[in-house]
Design a protein with these regions (language model features):
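Ser/Thr/Asn(+Pro)-rich, low-complexity disordered segments
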Residues: 1, 23-63, 67, 86-96, ...
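Well-ordered alpha-helical segments within folded domains of soluble proteins
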Residues: 1-10, 73-87, 139-140
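Substrate-binding cleft of carbohydrate-active enzyme catalytic domains
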Residues: 5-29
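Short, solvent-exposed segments of well-ordered alpha helices
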Residues: 20, 65-75
Length: 183
């Protein structure tokens, strides 16, 4: 849904009449993944459906029907969604939505740098990063689960695609991916 919100924000910033025509639809899309009012009887959507305020990042499915719990592989898509909220909030003058987007973006980026990219070198264990075992010599986790991390994608074991799942789409909101020159 983040792709739709981001695109809608881009159009809305250039064509204010777009908002008048499509605001209700866009607000429904946002509500589905980013409802920020807890215990709101007027909302048909759960509070921050895919985002865990405890973990500080999104989960791909929002459920834990896997042996290792929830999972998230496309951290960059989540970040793109939060950037879309910021832009849409700006385009519509909705300060609450802008603030929510800023919180989610900053929190998700911090978690991605920690859990996926391990930029401080204190999350991924030596067996994973230093050549001991089947998951040896990986500089990052491509998929984070509730109970493990892996270097894989659902459809391939090709490294370029595995890397790509956590950097695409590349937008101005992707600056975090290049902020650490050593990584």
């Amino acid at each position: 849904y983040g792709y739709f919100v981001n695109a809608a924000a881009q159009v809305a910033m250039r064509d204010p009449q777009f908002i008048q025509k499509y605001q209700n639809v866009i607000n429904e899309i946002i509500g589905d993944f980013a409802t920020y009012e807890e215990n709101n009887s007027n909302s048909r959507y759960p509070f921050l459906r895919y985002f865990s305020t405890y973990e500080g990042h999104s989960w791909a499915s929002g459920h834990a029907n896997f042996g290792d719990g929830n999972n998230q592989e496309s951290s960059s898509e989540a970040i793109n969604a939060w950037a879309g909220l910021i832009l849409y909030g700006q385009a519509t003058g909705n300060k609450e939505l802008t603030s929510l987007g800023m919180y989610l973006y900053a929190t998700e980026v911090s978690s991605v740098n920690c859990y996926w990219f391990d930029t401080d070198g204190d999350i991924l264990d030596e067996q994973y990063t230093e050549g001991k075992g089947e998951n040896a010599k990986y500089s990052q986790a491509s998929m984070v689960w509730g109970g493990k991390y892996t270097y894989a994608a659902w459809w391939t074991d090709e490294p370029l695609q595995i890397q790509g799942i956590n950097i695409l789409p590349m937008t101005p909101a992707s600056f975090y991916a290049a902020a650490n020159k050593d990584f």
